[in-house]
Amino acid sequence: MVWRRVVRQLVTLACEECKRRNYHTRKNRRNTPDRLQLRKFCPWCRRHTAHRETR
């Protein structure tokens, strides 16, 4: 079951506006090779903003 950990990678999501790293999630590198972008709530901006994967 070690190969499962290789496929799913732990990524950090940063707010597009304030650049703070608020969320951590896992993604499948085979299905999503490009950067992940989700709309999440930013506690510092106090609103929903786009959060993008950082490397």
Swiss-Prot record:
Arranged from A to Z, the UniProt key words for this protein are: Ribonucleoprotein, Ribosomal protein
Q: Which GO terms describe its biological process?
A: translation
For this record, the Gene Ontology CC terms, alphabetical, are: cytoplasm; ribonucleoprotein complex; ribosome
Q: Where are the transmembrane segments?
A: none
Tell me which positions the record assigns to the signal sequence: none
Pfam families cross-referenced by the UniProt entry: Ribosomal_L33
Question: What is a single molecular function from GO for this protein?
Answer: structural constituent of ribosome
Tell me the Gene3D superfamilies matching this sequence. Answer: Ribosomal protein L33 (2.20.28.120)
What does the sequence similarity comment in the record state about its family? Belongs to the bacterial ribosomal protein bL33 family.
State the protein's name: Large ribosomal subunit protein bL33
**Species of origin:** Rubrobacter xylanophilus (strain DSM 9941 / JCM 11954 / NBRC 16129 / PRD-1)
The record lists the lineage as: Bacteria, Bacillati, Actinomycetota, Rubrobacteria, Rubrobacterales
The coding gene here is rpmG
